[in-house]
Amino acid sequence: MSTKIAVLGGGAWGTALAAMAAKGGHESWLYARDAETVVAINKDRRNPRYLGDITLADGIRASTDAAAVVTGADAVLAVIPAQAMRNGLSELGTLIPQASPIVLCAKGIEQNTGRLMSEVVAEILPDHRIAALSGPSFASDVARGLPTAVTVACEDANTADRLAALLSGPAFRCYSTTDLKGVETGGALKNVLAIAAGAAIGRGYGASAQAALVTRGFAELRRIGQAMSARPETIMGLSGLGDLMLTCSSSQSRNYSYGLALGRGEDLTSRPLAEGVATAPIAAELCRKHNISAPIIDAVGALLDGKITIDEAVTALLNRPLKTED
């Protein structure tokens, strides 16, 4: 019996996940608002707006009809930007069958409320099972079928295991966990740290400074994870340390690239807004609320707010009181 995976979102990540599902032998449906994108995927097996140089796997059915896409789906992957998740699923969520688990594929914390994506969706669709997919993965790698490993989290262990089995494929390996908030915390906060790493390289501080920022940033991530009741193994795993390593070291990362441009003094007005920009002030406030020492996250928030320069941020970090390493 064939299985159906529905993907909501025709961007790079949504397209890649639809390609992954098709390569796994599933009935793969993709919802996109843009009619030209839908035609191109169905006719030419390409998404001209995203990943235009990649020929997509056979079997993807793209449509502008969200109801047709989600009907009978064994899983619905919500690939909607974090700050648009509430509006997106408020509009589309009523179409999703209650039996279909919703897998959140955006990494971020909602502005104004400070809620994780699962908390946002639980408000909108309280009767649905909610999961999250996160880990070190670039859309272009997944779309090309390059080896990738991620984590699928759901507070219901059986659902987490079923989703991991469903979404795993020839080159896409999923690990399961019930630590939903831990997975989401790592995925959201690494975006902020990636901006710091990119800014250090863009400013010319070198690889040593980059390594120091990532390592000490991970210490902050661990402290925040502990305050959020995340399991240590989750923060040390693919959705925490793994995603941090990838995002803080490659220009394929939108957040790292944003930091690079920031460090180089480039005009940022025409660049796509990186999710870490929205998350930074929320993360800083979260740390203050829980009395967590997070000087790097605080510095990124102040930098993006125009309160300090990169040089001032680095000087302040280097001149903090000496302490034992934690």
From Swiss-Prot:
Q: Which reaction does it catalyse?
A: sn-glycerol 3-phosphate + NAD(+) = dihydroxyacetone phosphate + NADH + H(+); sn-glycerol 3-phosphate + NADP(+) = dihydroxyacetone phosphate + NADPH + H(+)
Query: GO molecular function: any one?
Result: glycerol-3-phosphate dehydrogenase [NAD(P)+] activity
GO terms in the biological process aspect are: carbohydrate metabolic process; glycerol-3-phosphate biosynthetic process; glycerol-3-phosphate catabolic process; glycerophospholipid metabolic process; phospholipid biosynthetic process
Q: Name one GO cellular component term.
A: cytosol
**What InterPro entries does this protein map onto?**
6-PGluconate_DH-like_C_sf, 6PGD_dom2, G3P_DH_NAD-dep, G3P_DH_NAD-dep_C, G3P_DH_NAD-dep_N, NAD(P)-bd_dom_sf
EC main group: oxidoreductase
Residues that coordinate or bind NADPH? W13, R33, K107, A139, R254, L273, E275
Similarity-based family: Belongs to the NAD-dependent glycerol-3-phosphate dehydrogenase family.
Q: What is this protein called?
A: Glycerol-3-phosphate dehydrogenase [NAD(P)+]
- Species annotation: Brucella canis (strain ATCC 23365 / NCTC 10854 / RM-666)
Instruction: Name the gene behind this protein.
Output: gpsA
